[in-house]
Amino acid sequence: MHRRTFIKAFTLSASVIAMGMSFGVQAAETIKVGIMHSLSGTMAISETPLKDVALMTIDEINAKGGVLGKKLEPVVVDPASNWPLFAEKARQLLSQDKVAVVFGCWTSVSRKSVLPVFEELNGLLFYPVQYEGEEMSPNVFYTGAAPNQQAIPAVEYLMSEDGGSAKRFFLLGTDYVYPRTTNKILRAFLHSKGVEDKDIEEVYTPFGHSDYQTIVASIKKFSTGGKTAVVSTINGDSNVPFYKELANQGLKATDVPVVAFSVGEEELRGIDTKPLVGNLAAWNYFESVDNPTNQTFVAAYKAYAKAHKLPNADTVVTNDPMEATYVGLHMWAQAVEKAGTTDVD
């Protein structure tokens, strides 16, 4: 090889190596954050906004200098409302993408699917939705409400004079761990208040269920036995046909109020809510909270939606799990700053 050719080849190789080192340094200058929410399937209606608000929050943190002097880099995956796929995506985020933390899941079945992966790989999950309790892990931050913070106070209200003095309870939910465990807790609570089993009805439907004609008719029949309330733990897009059927059959809140634990502003955005006035939802947060902090949060999300051309950007809303995602991301960022490291331990 001629000396000039050798020098050119050496220079080219050195440049390629330097470029590789540069890319490696650039990669090391970011902190990867996993976002694991269903962007398709039956839970997409509820989970997609959590992805959006997580990305907004990351932009907000990065605009203020990031964390430990590094920008946050989001890694978004779509488990597609498929519970085993949640576990696969969690393993991908932790093992391949090397994220420092994951914000994700909605249903308890998805959380229970990923929990062994986070404990095996010592990952960190922030879970933003109400849950049934009876679980604790050093690898999970549960930022939603447990039954004693949401379900029991809501039912106590329904039993009060202000809440309608309900004597009978129709417990309607999607068929998985959260509704069944919550209703087991509620049944025990109702027993302690003197409510007998004959005055408690439990009905469960699959994820994605869309025909509520027979169930709403059953609610109407059950309500003839005394003052009745419905406690709904329906999840995902099934909420839309359920509330539409209530309106179709003329079941008003003044006759049989419905209190929901898994429906908020987002799930009701696409239906006519006028016939549903008086029905209830129980959450830690609502968009209508009137204080400067929330006004800033809501305005920021609406501006983000328009700037990023999110679907129906002019009518976007905020809800409890979105607020919990926002708070959770800031909480994690502040903890990392204080600890000086992203290490889970």
What is each model feature region?
Residues L93-C105, F126-P128, R168-G173, G225-G236, ...:
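Periplasmic-binding protein-like
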Residues R3-I7:
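N-terminal export leaders
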Residues G34-V53, V77-P84, W106-V109, T174-R180, ...:
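Extracytoplasmic "Venus flytrap"
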Residues S22-G24:
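N-terminal signal peptide c-region/cleavage motif recognized by signal peptidases
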Residues I45-D52, G65-E135, T143, T205-Q213, ...:
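Beta-alpha junction/loop-to-helix N-cap segments that form part of ligand/metal-binding clefts
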Residues E88, N139-Q249, P292:
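Extracellular/periplasmic Venus flytrap/periplasmic-binding protein
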Residues A28, D52-P74, G164, S192-D197:
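Signal peptide-proximal N-terminal region
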Residues L246-Y326, V336, G340:
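Extracellular/periplasmic periplasmic-binding protein-like sensory domains
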